[in-house]
Amino acid sequence: MPIPNDPNLIYFRKRIRILNALGPYLRENNCQPTSFYFDCFSICIDANIEPEEREFHGWWLEMELVNETFEYHYQFGVYNKAGNWVEKPIPKQYQHDVTKTLNQFYEKLSICLTEQLKFNLKPSSILAKTLVLSAA
């Protein structure tokens, strides 16, 4: 078996381990050596139904390594019972709580990337200017 010489492959497991420590946000199955996927089920839409039927308001964030900087973009929406995110506006009464979970995660992610992994973090060019999170 050949020894991998791609630095992104070599450090992928280390990055996964460190990013997993941020909490239940990282979805390893959706990650690649230079791209990572996070999400958060912020608000349960109906807690009175069976757990496997529940839907959630929340967000998902993707980041990709580009020239020693991780570029991110995120979206808000509903995690449906089929297990997929659907981009949808968050109802006004839940916007504060959903945004708060994203901001809290972003602070942790920013510190983790800059202090532990020694990478910068910046918004992707595809992220609308009105959605950009500033560094903590």
Task: Pin down the residues of each PLM region.
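Compositionally biased, intrinsically disordered linkers/stalks adjacent to structured regions
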Residues: V86-A136
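Amphipathic, interaction-prone secondary-structure segments
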Residues: P24-N67
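Intrinsically disordered, low-complexity regulatory segments enriched in Ser/Thr/Pro
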Residues: E53-H96
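Contiguous hydrophobic segments
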Residues: M1-P7, E52-W60, E64-N67, P123-A136
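Short, charged/polar micro-motifs that form catalytic or ligand-binding hotspots
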Residues: N8, F12, I49-E53, K88, ...
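N-terminal "first-domain core" detector
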Residues: M1-P24
